[in-house]
UniProtKB/Swiss-Prot annotation:
It catalyses: ATP + H2O + a folded polypeptide = ADP + phosphate + an unfolded polypeptide. This is Chaperonin GroEL. ATP binds at residues 30-33, 51, 87-91, 415, 495. PROSITE patterns: CHAPERONINS_CPN60. It is an enzyme of class 5 (isomerase). It holds the Pfam family Cpn60_TCP1. It comes from Carsonella ruddii (strain PV). Keywords: ATP-binding, Chaperone, Cytoplasm, Isomerase, Nucleotide-binding. Gene3D superfamilies: GroEL, GroEL-like equatorial domain, TCP-1-like chaperonin intermediate domain.
């Protein structure tokens, strides 16, 4: 174990503050509709131009280990806010910077850091309660579009495309952002449930023009078993033939005489049949098969449940209005599943998402939930250059997160004005002692910081705008993109409550930790190896 370097008290806090300010100063230039660009050097690629606060924060590593600790702690504010709400990272960083700078000054002047932290925590808690009181539900298309536009730095096209996507696949539907091939942004929607498995044999093709197989008003057999023996399916084929229905089969695999029998029946026109392999692998495959079973109203035929394939009857089969299968994909439309059962399944998956610690698992669970909820929308990003595409893609992803947050918890007036309205309601807040009151004043001062920075980035005078807004009431605010005052809702300047709330809570949490730091320990750096 190598030697360690240790700093104590004010010396430690000053190093923390330097790191916090270096990171925050780089990040906060991106805040607001007139936020500036930051260029990030990429070792093996062209430089990345971005206005995304969390992207800027992630790039920053400082040489001095003590200063770097401060930078990394504020980076945690940005990341935590991004994880919870998907946006608001720059706002959180600006709030944290003010809390840390003012808090460290107070501690150096002799104020008790623990009471200071209690005062800050009390203010943040009350501010969150006040935010929730003034929130307005975000359910209509216009509000959704406005939230997306604000988060995308004022691009109305992005706001509209996100709003259209939500209209098409629903509020819980999966919306993904991919790189497009043209200059224009495009929205592509896959209705119903789609999975990445196509027909087992080309002999099932019914439409030669686009090489696809289509079944309408068909019965559905789903099993997690491999079908190779014709005896397993003879009984059910006879029952379906008598009913003059078509059959769609999903199985682990179909081979040998069983596959030959299905192909011959299909070619001769005795029975319209389509067979595909089950999607996914391992445990995920079983869960996907259960999803499809619930969506189509069928029973998953599994020997684990004591059901043998050769003994099944029509009551265990599901139904769909239309199934289309190509070489690579299959889409199920109009599944005959019970709505309550589908809702229960969606709620179960939602719970699994909230409990999952893996980003990959969360993504796969969200895909499954979307397919049950009604479809998947893909926003394809268009641009002239790869650098522009990457920057635009990051902004659309931010806007999408903001929009989801708005639908979840509602909206408040944006541009930092909602925090000023809260400020007026908290001016009489009192702590248990004078040191706590000082903490309350620090947190109240921090509430002004986002508005000040937005105005500064737009070239305005922060103190004048702040005083004008403080002396007004309700929805009156400042549009930094035009330099005009007016009703923020009418001007379409709104923020999701979840984003503002998460920014406040993350900033208060990390700010309090940094203020109460008394010692810092780091490895000795080998200057020769640098």
């Amino acid at each position: 174990m190598g030697y360690k370097k240790i700093k104590f008290g004010d010396d430690a806090r000053k190093s923390l503050a330097i790191g916090v300010n270096i990171l925050a100063d780089a990040v906060k230039t991106t805040l607001g509709p007139k936020g500036r660009n930051v260029i990030l050097d990429k070792s093996f690629n062209s430089p990345l131009v971005t206005k995304d606060g969390v992207s800027v924060a992630k790039e920053i590593e400082l040489k001095d280990k003590f200063e770097n600790m401060g930078a990394q702690m504020v980076k945690e504010v940005a990341s935590k806010t991004s994880d919870v709400a998907g946006d608001g990272t720059t706002t959180a960083t600006v709030l944290a910077q003010t809390i840390v700078n003012e808090g460290i000054k107070a501690v150096i002047s002799g104020i008790n850091p623990m009471d200071l932290k209690r005062g800050i925590d009390k203010t943040i808690y009350q501010a969150v309660l006040e935010l929730k009181k003034i929130s307005i539900p975000c359910v209509d298309t216009l509000s959704i579009s406005q939230v997306g536009t604000i988060s995308a730095n004022g691009e109305t096209i992005i706001g509209k495309i996100i709003s259209d996507a939500m209209n098409r696949v629903g509020k819980n539907g999966v919306i993904t952002v991919d790189e497009g091939r043209g200059f224009e942004d495009e929205l592509e929607v896959v209705e119903g449930m789609q999975f990445d498995r196509g027909y087992i044999s080309p002999y099932f093709i019914s439409n030669q023009e686009n090489m696809s197989s289509i079944l309408e008003n068909c019965l559905i057999l789903i099993t997690d078993k491999k079908i190779s023996n014709v005896r397993d399916i003879v009984n059910i084929l006879e029952l379906i033939s008598k009913k003059n229905k078509s059959l769609f089969i999903i199985a682990e695999d179909i081979e040998g005489e069983a596959l030959a029998t299905l192909v011959i029946n299909n070619i001769r026109g005795v029975l319209k049949i389509l067979a595909v392999k089950a999607p996914g692998f391992g445990d995920r495959r079983k869960e996907i098969l259960k999803d499809i079973s619930i969506l189509t109203g069928s029973t998953l035929i599994s020997e684990e449940l004591g059901i043998k394939l050769e003994n099944i009857d029509l009551s265990l089969l599901g139904f769909a209005k239309k199934i289309t299968s190509t070489k690579e994909n299959t889409i199920i439309l109009g599944g005959g599943g019970d709505e309550n059962s589908i809702k229960k399944r969606i709620n179960t998956i939602k719970k699994q998402i909230s409990e999952s610690l893996s980003d990959y698992d969360k993504e796969k669970l969200q895909e499954r939930m979307a397919k049950l909820a009604g479809g998947v929308a893909v926003i394809r990003v268009g641009s002239a250059t790869e650098i522009e595409m990457k920057e635009k893609k990051a902004r659309i992803e931010d806007a999408l997160h903001s929009t989801r947050a708005a639908v979840e918890e509602g909206v408040v007036i944006g541009g930092g004005v909602s925090l000023i309205r809260i400020l007026n309601k908290l001016k009489n807040l009192q702590g248990d002692n004078e040191d706590q009151n000082y903490g309350i004043q620090i947190a109240l001062k921090a509430l002004e910081a986002p508005l000040r920075q937005i105005v500064k980035n737009s070239g305005g005078e922060p103190s004048i705008v702040l005083n004008n807004i403080k002396s007004s009431s309700n929805n009156f605010g400042y549009d930094a993109s035009t330099g005009k005052y007016g009703d923020m809702f009418k001007m379409g300047i709104i923020d999701p409550v979840k984003v503002t709330r998460s920014a406040l809570q993350s900033a208060g949490s990390i700010g309090g930790l940094l203020i109460t730091t008394e010692a810092m320990i780091a490895d000795y750096s080998d200057e020769k190896s640098v």
